[in-house]
DNA sequence: ACTAAAGAACTC
DNA sequence: AGTTCTTTAGTG
């Protein structure tokens, strides 16, 4: 019998294994990689075939009689290639998650199908006692009238019973009065456009026949000029040609109205404003020469391109992409945030106008699907986007570029908690592709790996045209306070703003906190108002609401303190909203635009804000760290960083690294075109090496000092970290389970070097929705051994434990 | 995640 | 006893 091993697309750890199905004769063409529709339990779900095998009854053993047949195929071709399956399997093993959970990342949307339940009446039960009730009778009669309807359709037909329809339907199914059927439909919608196709040759004689039908004559002329005599209705409409005219001409048999699929692409009309750089610098050439042999021979290798801001890393990316495309291989270009795709698309479009698709999670499902279709048809070979672009179905990747490789947003912070760098590296290995990590300030991990010889370091230390780096000035905020300035804005920064505006130039100001006030406290009893779900302080926003930046929950500001009923409630700390207000007061003539998560909810909000700023409609761009990333605005000559060190006091071993990178990156935004920029950094820790090295743009200096600390504390890159989060309603159970694991770990690794386990300790959000959370941290030099140990302990199958490999937040 | 079956609580 | 709500096991 022909059988298939199938992983069902259900994200539950306890069923993270293959189930065997029989393959009916009419589906005998199915192979590994196909998405299918299968019966599972009492319902039908999507599944992924991972292998197909001919099996005898003996081989099947006692399962022989229990096999259910695969119902249908979801697509017309296999969705997962062998390489994709291989990558998904490796990643599932590495991150200790289920294969299905990993595989569903390789599709746009979590599932390829939408399953609807269709209810049908059972005729034999027409006189069931339960149907004496009017509501039940109405539903039954409604279904008896026609074919069978979904819940939504019944609700539409019987609006009176809509509210308790679910209960009615459940009940009727329970008694067998109604039957259920599961129907799978495509989730995404293909879009079509109508177009006119010219059938005849347009000769002067033919046009003469339409002397008295001017509109149709015009249409003929337009179509004869068009490519292949085809033109979309939308384009014709733009030329004031009505559908009536088109239909008339179709009646006459001279044209044909047809339909074709259009692939949506909201980046299609990106204007080509980028000037191609013609002469490469010496450094650029060196970098390209180092990588080219590997690309030409189709050999995997990893490179770290360390180039200061303005050294022309993008041009290196483009040159390498050209070479990969010339060999017929595909290219993936990753950026840390969706907002930065526009920038890269712009640069690449100048060289590859039609060879690009954009892929990220803010696109609609259909749009992502259209992008996949374009890639599959060979309509584009360069995928640009955020993390999720890595999972585009590509069969021949030659080059993976990861810009700003140090950026923490490359780590997915929900399950499966993968790091794009790990995925990129594994894909590069499987495809024998070149991996190119780019950064001005590489992560300590990557830089360390170049010293270990695992990656090849390429450097570009000079800015193009040898432009000077900006002048950086540090302002000690303690000093400011002593001088009597209690504003967020120091006087030197205020002065810089005024001077810059006087010259007609622009300023970027970065404050790493959104909202108005960072916490709200009662002055009588000291109670800080906290989120009901996670107990973290709520942030006050100017719209009068308190919001939790962790759970995205908002609530109104209470009139009196919830603890002591005092009316003395005050706002402390400052965010971007408050700074915006203060700027208006201190520099009334300044036109300020704010960019943070609150003002960038829509797909193109980032681009719109930056565009307005670029067009000089505003003087000051004020925002959170997103203003520090990758934008190049010529007229910006000054940058202010409000509290560069706010992260230094966090309980995170990467605090110093974060602070250093924030300063270097933000400072890099100033003065990229001719004029030397000026940067002011406000800090309470002017002596800290992260601040001093940041100001001096001294990566090596920072690296050396930080590495000493990391080694002393056995932190990455000298170890790798695995975070385990234990959750339980009972505090003691959560803690006890964690404790048990710690004991088992110590037993297992007794005497082994390079293994350390810490905890359990309460998580930052110690209690979430009534569930207690404890954290255990493992530091190891032998990650595979730890992964193996966790698998032995069956930890990856437990619903109450979340495993995070290479976590970003420790607690 | 969802279903179906088994068990516990509740109504009459 | 009959019904309804809750818990639990199992999905090929």
For each predicted feature, which ranges?
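Short amphipathic alpha-helix segments
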Residues: 735-758
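Accessory, non-ATPase domains that flank or precede helicase/AAA+ motor cores in DNA-metabolism machines
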Residues: 1-383, 388-439, 451-467, 748, ...
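Short, flexible, solvent-exposed loop/turn segments with mixed acidic/basic and small polar residues
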Residues: 141, 712-716, 763-769
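Short proline/glycine- and acidic-rich turn/helix-capping motifs at secondary-structure junctions
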Residues: 759-769, 802-811
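Inter-lobe coupling/hinge segments of SF2-like helicase ATPases
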Residues: 275-281, 285, 289, 298-735, ...
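Generic solvent-exposed, charged/amphipathic alpha-helical segments
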Residues: 89-92, 155, 494, 580, ...
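C-terminal effector/interaction modules appended to NTPase cores
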Residues: 769-771, 790
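Short amphipathic beta-strand starts and helix->beta connectors
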Residues: 702-711, 750-764
């Amino acid at each position: 019998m022909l059988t298939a091993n199938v992983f069902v697309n259900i994200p539950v750890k306890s069923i993270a294994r293959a189930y065997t199905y029989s393959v009916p004769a009419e589906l005998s063409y199915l192979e590994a990689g196909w998405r299918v529709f299968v019966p599972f339990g009492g319902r039908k779900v999507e599944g992924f075939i991972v292998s197909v095998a001919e099996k005898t009854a003996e081989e099947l053993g006692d399962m022989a009689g229990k096999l259910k047949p695969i119902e249908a195929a979801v697509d017309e071709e296999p969705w997962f290639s062998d390489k994709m399956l291989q990558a998904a399997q490796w990643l599932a093993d590495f991150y200790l998650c289920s294969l299905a959970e990993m595989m569903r990342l390789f599709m746009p949307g979590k599932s390829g199908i939408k399953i609807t339940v269709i209810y049908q009446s059972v005729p034999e039960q027409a006189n069931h006692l339960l149907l004496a009730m009017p509501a039940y009778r109405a539903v039954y009669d409604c279904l008896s009238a026609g074919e069978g309807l979904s819940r939504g359709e019944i609700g539409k037909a019987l609006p009176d019973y809509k509210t308790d329809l679910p209960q009615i339907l459940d009940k009727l199914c329970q008694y067998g009065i109604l039957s259920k059927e599961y129907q799978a439909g495509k989730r995404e919608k293909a879009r079509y456009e109508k177009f006119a196709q010219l059938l005849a040759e347009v000769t002067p004689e033919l046009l003469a026949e339409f002397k008295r039908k001017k509109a149709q004559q015009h249409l003929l002329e337009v179509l004869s000029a068009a490519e292949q005599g085809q033109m979309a209705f939308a384009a014709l409409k733009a030329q004031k040609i009505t559908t009536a005219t088109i239909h008339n001409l179709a009646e006459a048999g001279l044209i044909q109205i047809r339909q074709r699929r259009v692939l949506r692409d909201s980046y299609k009309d990106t204007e080509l404003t980028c000037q191609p750089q013609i002469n490469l610098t010496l450094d650029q050439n060196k970098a390209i020469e180092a990588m080219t042999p590997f690309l030409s021979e189709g050999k995997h290798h990893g490179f770290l391109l360390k180039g200061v801001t303005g050294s022309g890393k993008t041009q290196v990316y483009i040159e390498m992409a050209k070479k990969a495309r010339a060999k017929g291989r595909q290219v993936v270009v990753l950026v840390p945030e969706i907002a930065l795709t526009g920038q890269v698309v712009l640069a690449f479009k100048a060289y590859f106008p039609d060879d690009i698709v954009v892929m990220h999670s803010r696109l609609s499902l259909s749009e992502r699907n259209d992008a996949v279709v374009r890639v599959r048809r060979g309509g584009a070979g360069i995928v640009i986007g955020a993390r999720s672009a890595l999972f585009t179905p590509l069969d021949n990747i030659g080059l993976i570029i990861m810009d700003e490789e140090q950026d923490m947003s490359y780590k997915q912070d929900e399950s499966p908690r993968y790091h794009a760098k790990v995925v990129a590296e594994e894909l590069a290995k499987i495809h024998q592709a070149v991996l190119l990590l780019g950064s001005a300030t590489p992560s300590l991990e990557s830089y360390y790996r170049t010293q270990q010889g695992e990656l090849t370091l390429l450097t570009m230390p000079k800015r193009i045209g040898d432009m000077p780096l900006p002048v950086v000035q540090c302002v000690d905020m303690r000093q400011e306070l002593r001088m009597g300035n209690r504003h967020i804005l120091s006087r030197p920064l205020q002065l810089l703003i005024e001077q810059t505006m006087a010259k007609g130039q622009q300023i970027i100001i970065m404050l790493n906190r959104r909202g108005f006030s960072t916490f709200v406290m009662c002055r009588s009893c000291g109670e800080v108002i906290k989120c009901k779900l996670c107990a973290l302080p709520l942030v006050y926003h100017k719209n009068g609401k308190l919001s939790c930046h962790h759970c995205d929950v908002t609530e109104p500001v209470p009139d009196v303190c919830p603890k002591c009923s005092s009316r003395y409630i005050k706002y402390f700390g400052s965010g971007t909203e408050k700074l915006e207000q203060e700027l208006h007061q201190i520099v009334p003539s300044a036109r300020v635009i704010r960019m943070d998560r609150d003002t960038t909810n829509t797909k193109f909000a980032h681009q719109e804000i930056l565009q307005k700023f670029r067009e000089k409609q505003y003087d000051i761009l004020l925002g959170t760290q997103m203003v520090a990333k990758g934008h190049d605005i010529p007229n910006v000559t000054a940058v202010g960083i409000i509290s560069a060190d706010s992260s230094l006091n966090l309980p995170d071993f990467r605090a110093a690294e974060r602070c250093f990178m924030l300063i270097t990156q933000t400072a890099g935004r100033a003065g990229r075109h001719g004029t030397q920029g000026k940067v002011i950094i406000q800090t309470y820790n002017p002596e800290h090496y992260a601040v001093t090295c940041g100001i001096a743009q001294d990566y090596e200096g920072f690296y050396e000092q930080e590495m000493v600390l990391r080694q002393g504390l056995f932190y990455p890159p000298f170890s790798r970290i695995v975070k385990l989060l234990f959750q339980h309603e009972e505090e003691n159970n959560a803690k006890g389970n964690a404790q048990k694991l710690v004991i088992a770990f110590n037993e297992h690794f007794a005497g082994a070097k390079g293994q350390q386990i810490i905890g359990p300790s309460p998580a930052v959000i110690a209690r979430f929705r009534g569930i207690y959370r404890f954290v255990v941290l493992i530091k190891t030099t032998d990650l595979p051994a730890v992964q193996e140990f966790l698998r032995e302990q069956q930890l990856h199958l437990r619903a109450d434990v979340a495993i995070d490999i290479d976590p970003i937040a420790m607690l």
